[in-house]
């Protein structure tokens, strides 16, 4: 099988989901390519789209709440969204790519490429089988205007949510959000601490704002610093992502008991080494944490799909959600002290999240391609 994974740099979760499927495809002996489709037209265009998104997340996240509300209103209107029409300009680019690089299936963990493929289909251009992977625990605006052969959704109990928005029930596959195999490794908290060079007698709180360093990390750290300074057994680990300004600011503070990192390729290990993970509720990062079985405290949700992610996780007992930073020390202390509460959270994660999502998605892709070949016989 020859697969193409199309993603976009607007949020690390989409790319991470795509890379998880890419990794699994390679393991299964398939040919697979992953790319950002906009780079085929212009690297400047691709970079501009990515930078605009990242800058908005870091500086004016509330703008996403406004856009999300507009999207939910717009989706009720009897015509297609601006996103659909903007992506029409990519049809010729992708048609040329397929002529030069034929593939059996296109897998898309991002809405924009799905809009491109839908445009091509509606213009009578022959395209491969298509699969969309939802990376949030909600049907995000305009997903319903795409026309893919299969839609992978995070969980079975979200089926009615997607059907209600217009996705055909027979196209829905509740296989979960795919995660990198590193999150599936089974090492104890003590083993991970030793591998990372951390103190085995300390309790670590891991704080991130997602791959782009969004969220009120500074305020969160300020609230938790006094708490951790009063507790000799507690230390903070902060991962800033690509937010260089935040990283430099925290480095200059050089606060005791606080370890500051930029990017890390050992996120799974840091999660398993931690007693608590504080993060904004991105769909992919939350799923990764649940796969690792680490207690989660969601905060600083970007209004819109992240609010829905937080509600889903809290509603299923997989996390605690709190946006008031002055309440964080009390909640953190409760989680660290109450081992039963932490254990219950991890049990709920284990019962709700499909760890084998990447493998299941690859099996579905194989099935779709096999059916396509059978139909052509």
Q: Predicted regions span which residues?
A:
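Conserved N-terminal ligand/cofactor-binding loop architecture of enzyme catalytic domains
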Residues: 20-95
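A nucleotide-sugar donor-handling region in carbohydrate enzymes
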Residues: 149-211
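Conserved donor-nucleotide binding/catalytic region of nucleotide-linked donor-dependent transferases
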Residues: 188, 320, 325-326, 333-350, ...
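Donor-nucleotide binding loops and adjacent catalytic segments primarily
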Residues: 191, 198-273
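Acidic donor-binding loop of glycosyltransferase active sites
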Residues: 272-282
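Short hydrophobic beta-strand element within catalytic cores of glycosyltransferases
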Residues: 277-279, 295-304
